[in-house]
Amino acid sequence: MTPVNAKHYLHDDIIRKLTELKLAELSDYVDELCADPECVNLDFIGKFEVITNRLYQNRINELIKNLLKNATLREPQASIAGLYYEAERLLSRELMIELGTCDFMRSQTNIIIEGPTGAGKTYIACALAKAAVGKCYRVKYIRLPDLQQELEDCYHYNRSLKNLKQKYTRPALLVIDEWMMRASSDSLSSFLLDVMEGRYTTSSTIFCTQSKQESWHAMLGGNTMAEAIIDRIVQNSLTITLGNLNMRALRNPLMKYKNVKE
């Protein structure tokens, strides 16, 4: 009989097989289970359920960790629970709690967050994005100026434009920050049309912007391509318009608002 490893309850051969199956952590779970007095009286099925649940939760935690890393959120610490509600801010607690369930993604609804600089648009978007990550959705955050730079680099260094399109078409939730802060180039507008077309009716996008929607048409070129981009965004969208409360000022430690989380 194969000897039992002095450090483990399972035989060395079983541990080797688990490792080959990419289930090496099961050996540790068995050790912990056998050492737990509360699990001594569990039958086989009970112990199997404990180990399976532990393995499943560990894999989910690792998945969420990797998804959050790949999301490249500007504010990865953001959360729905950390949102600040003040009458002057015009932000609905009920709406944010509802959006935090990520049900809007099932209907491929886009969210447009409008507000002046410092209103906390990025934090809200990242809070929703992090909620989506917590439900194991693939998420990506990008500033539009950075996306434009990536596109220019693609052309300059002859990189794959197809790969760049897939990078922003595939995520279940895409966050585009600093949307329409300046006029778009023809190449960027063309790229945005391809991305929006690829995401239309399949996934959701969050736009953070200081610009009113009425100004987008001119900033996107004032042509039929601009109309096509806007149509794919706004036809199935929800707009959150924030007030003039400056969240950066509230986060300043010199201000009297000491309990502001956002």
Name what the model sees in each region:
Residues 1-21, 25-27:
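Charged, compositionally biased N-terminal leader segments and the immediate start
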Residues 19, 23-75:
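Interdomain "pre-motor" coupling segment immediately N-terminal to P-loop NTPase/helicase cores
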Residues 78-102:
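N-terminal pre-Walker A segment at the start of P-loop NTPase domains
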Residues 108-124:
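Walker A/P-loop nucleotide-binding motif
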Residues 130-142:
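Post-Walker A helix-loop "phosphate-sensing" segment adjacent to the P-loop in P-loop NTPases
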Residues 136-138, 170-173, 200-207:
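Loop/turn-to-beta-strand initiation segments
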